[in-house]
Amino acid sequence: MAQLLRLKPQPDGVFCYNDPLATGAMDYAIDQGARIPEDVAIIGCGNLHYDDSLRVGLSSIDQHSRRIGEGAARIALGILGSRVPRPPETVILQPELVIRASTRRKAHRRGR
């Protein structure tokens, strides 16, 4: 995050691998004087529930991890309980963008 904040021009936003990395990036940026989302927007992945413990609400991609786990368990139990080989199964879950304050920026582009 330190390198990104030193770039000229700075990036408009940062997409982090997961929510814990995003919260760390956001805390660092704020500690360095950056305004979230005015100076840099930050989004994570996982939609972990931080309640009100964050200084700025974190936008996130909800991958529906619980549904993934439940589906994987159902498939695994089906395989274990069957004497007949099962064909491969494809399961597609649509991720959901959960918008919170860390990416809520006014429509106009900030000056640099």
What are these regions (language model features)?
Residues 2-111:
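Flexible loop/turn connectors
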